[in-house]
From Swiss-Prot:
Low complexity bias spans: 430-448
Protein source organism: Oryza sativa subsp. japonica
InterPro entries in the cross-refs: DUF7699, SAP_dom, Znf_CCCH, Znf_CCCH_sf
Listed name of the protein: Zinc finger CCCH domain-containing protein 62
Keywords of this entry: DNA-binding, Metal-binding, Zinc, Zinc-finger
Acidic residues bias spans: 18-54
Region (Disordered): 1-77, 288-349, 405-532, 546-602, 634-673
Listed Polar residues bias regions: 326-349, 405-419, 472-502, 522-532, 546-565, 575-591
Keyword tRNA-binding tagged: no
Length: 702
């Protein structure tokens, strides 16, 4: 019998209790106190002493997303779509809310142990005796925790809270009867009002979306005091925190329970309030509430507007970035298809300068002769730009020597007879081209300068030959009386322009110190007739056996400017009586002061005459040309020395000081620079010279 009894006890122990079965059945569904389930968020919150006192207070547990439909300050359009909000909140249904609601099923109190039962009995006894101050702090908090009340504050606050809870529990409906709620405050409730309102409780399946309503299971009437009201920062929804004074109906709330409810749910059913002792104070509280609501709505409007502006700026920025990227892609593609080759003007000019001049003139490009530098010299640039000016006043002479070029000193042209010098220049250039072969493939700039008289025909009316008196028979007979210097010149010193194709300024021949045979007068005359000199604007120097030279004298009258005239202010011509002071090579230069007649007029070395016959018209042209070419050059006393004269012509525009050149120092280095005086061809041929003592050539032929 004992064994079956034990088996029955084990079987009963294995079976679940009926109370547990009921709890499991009830746990399959959850209850919602009203048609809006969001007010359930405040249910089941356990206030413990470890919580922050400020956060645990009823004023700090309001929902920031609460609102009101009936409140004048409530904006219904700002509430949003309730169905969408319900769907989103349904996904959070299985969080802490479900576990908290399990502890409050119906009106059952939580299970208490022996200590809790002893504490409740002790509190009831002390309350009945009026000795509630004997409770300790931890005992006060234990009592409040059992009734889910706030635990913040000191002992006095805790004792006051316990007295109020006991009073409300026993005398709540007596102290706050339904008949005392006489004023309708639907849509206009504020902090401090004592209100009564109803709630509908719906039941739905656990885990179902919150937007889906369940079936109605009951109603509940609540009476409480509004201890806090606020506007949410996100949606400006009005939220109330109500301390329950009494509750009856389906699953009533315990006394002094803090209930969080939205304004629209509070104002959904009829809401009534008790009158205040001072209604003016309520009006002030109501105005302060409306002001906060106005500021909250304005802040929300500004925030929405800023958010819209930011969205538009973001869209515009994206469009601009997209357009810029498209433009960059188009530029890159265009550059890839059509590359741009930038060629500067200098590059084109350099390429043009590198063209071989021989190809332009039909000559072979592989000529063994040396070519001039492709870079333009200052002379070439001047010759290139001179035709652009209507009245050229400077002429450059280029002397070629083994691939080098030099610009002669520019001289001021006398504008009285410019056609004479151009005519002589053209004839001289033509003779040089016929007698000597081209030295360089590149044409000499002297050929370009010969075209100037053709470009300026207005000067041709000045091309008139000056009349000259023919010499007498005695003067013609004196031509046959030549000296050893004339014979030495005619036999051994050919014109440098024919031998080397250049002038004395750029080329000099080696001078032999041995005596030369004396030619006959017939040979001298025949030589001058067969080979007249064809050089112009050039100075030739030849060594004499004795090494003597005669200084030059002025050959023009600066005041009258009579060039080649037969009328002279000085005495008549006397042959072989030219007053000139010889200067020995290597001397200290003490005699050059006597050799100089006119110190103010600078006379460069004159070239030989074009022809030895007085009938030739070019002879007169040559004389006039020398006057125009050398007439206006000035030279100071310190600049001119007859031993340095040819060096001044050689260097052109380069200045020389007293220490640059000395006869003794440079004699071994370049002995060709010292030139003796040349015999006067006119005097040898005609026996008299129109220049007289002013002639720069030597008349002493003995």
């Amino acid at each position: 019998m004992a064994a079956p009894a034990a088996d029955d006890d084990d079987h009963r122990a294995a079976l679940p209790r009926e109370e547990d079965d009921g709890e499991e059945e009830e746990g399959s569904e959850e209850e919602v106190e009203s048609d809006d389930e969001e007010e359930e968020e405040g249910e089941g919150y356990d206030w413990s002493e470890e919580d922050d006192p400020e956060a645990a207070s009823l004023a700090g547990i309001c929902d920031p997303d609460a609102g009101s439909y009936d409140d004048p300050t409530f904006d219904p359009a700002a509430d949003g779509d309730l169905e969408v909000d319900a769907v989103l909140r349904s996904r959070m249904a299985r969080m802490s809310l479900s576990s908290a609601r399990k502890d409050r099923k119906g009106s059952r109190m939580p299970k208490m142990g022996k200590e809790e039962m002893d504490l409740l009995a002790m509190v009831d006894k002390l309350m009945h005796d009026g000795q509630l101050e004997k409770l300790k702090v931890y005992e006060c908090k234990a009592y409040l925790r059992m009734h889910k009340l706030r635990l913040s504050g000191n002992k006095e606050v805790l004792l006051t809270r316990i007295r109020g809870q006991i009073e409300v529990k026993t005398m709540g409906e007596v102290k706050y009867p339904v008949s005392s709620f006489v004023l309708n405050c639907q849509g206009d409730s504020c902090k401090g009002d004592v209100v009564v309102f109803e709630q509908n409780i719906y039941k739905r399946k656990k885990g179902a979306p919150r937007g889906v309503k369940g079936h109605l299971c009951g109603q509940r009437t609540n009476a409480g005091r509004i201890i806090k009201e606020s506007y949410g920062t996100k949606k400006q929804q009005h939220t109330f925190t109500i301390e329950i004074l009494w509750s009856r109906g389906y699953k009533p709330w315990p006394p002094l329970h803090p209930l969080l409810i939205k304004g629209r749910n509070l104002y959904k059913d009829k809401t009534m309030r008790q009158p205040w002792l001072d209604e003016e104070e309520r009006n002030r509280a109501l105005q302060e509430k409306h002001a906060r609501g106005y500021v909250a709505r304005k802040t929300r409007e500004v925030r929405i507007k800023d958010k819209e502006n930011e969205r538009m700026r973001r869209l515009n920025r994206n469009k601009e970035n997209k357009s810029k990227g498209q433009d960059n892609m188009n530029k890159k593609s265009s550059q890839a298809v059509f590359p741009q080759h930038t060629v500067t003007t200098n590059t084109v000019q350099k390429r043009a300068e590198k063209i071989i001049p021989s190809l332009q003139h039909g000559e072979s490009g592989n000529s063994s002769q040396q070519h001039l530098s492709s870079k333009q010299t200052p002379t070439e640039q001047l010759l290139h730009y001179l035709p652009q000016f209507p009245h050229p006043q400077q002429h450059n002479e280029v002397l070629l020597q083994k691939g080098t070029s030099r610009t002669s000193t520019t001289q001021l042209i006398n504008h009285q007879a410019p056609s004479l010098q151009h005519a002589v220049k053209v004839e001289t250039t033509q003779q040089q081209q016929q007698q000597q072969p081209p030295k360089s493939i590149k044409p000499a700039p002297i050929q370009q300068s010969s075209a100037y008289p053709q470009q300026y025909p207005k000067h041709q009316h000045h091309n008139q030959a000056l009349p000259r008196v023919p010499p007498s028979q005695e003067q013609r007979a004196a031509v046959s009386q030549t000296s050893a210097a004339r014979q030495d010149f005619t036999n051994h010193q050919a014109p440098p322009s024919r031998q080397h194709g250049g002038s004395e300024n750029m080329r000099r021949q080696e001078i032999s110190s041995r005596p030369t045979p004396t030619p006959t007068p017939q040979q001298a005359v025949s030589y001058t007739q067969q080979q007249p000199p064809n050089h112009q604007y050039r100075n030739e120097a030849f060594w004499q056996q004795g090494g003597t030279s005669t200084s030059r004298t002025g050959f023009m009258d600066r005041q009258s400017n009579n060039w080649g005239s037969t009328d002279h202010d000085k005495p008549a011509f006397q042959p072989f009586t030219q007053k000139a002071k010889t200067y020995q090579h290597g001397s200290n230069g003490s005699g050059h002061h006597q050799a100089r007649v006119d110190r103010e007029t600078h006379q460069p070395l004159r070239s030989r005459n074009q022809d030895y016959h007085w009938e030739d018209q070019s002879y007169h042209h040559q004389q006039n040309h020398h006057q125009n070419y050398y007439g206006h050059r000035q030279m100071s006393q310190d600049q001119y020395h007859h031993q340095q004269n040819h060096h001044q012509n050689y260097h052109g525009r380069q200045g020389m000081n007293g220490n640059q050149y000395h006869d003794r120092q440079n004699h071994n280095q370049n002995p060709q620079r010292f030139r003796p005086w040349k015999p006067c061809f006119i005097y040898q041929q005609q026996g008299w010279c129109p220049y007289g003592e002013n002639c720069k050539f030597m008349h002493d032929l003995r």
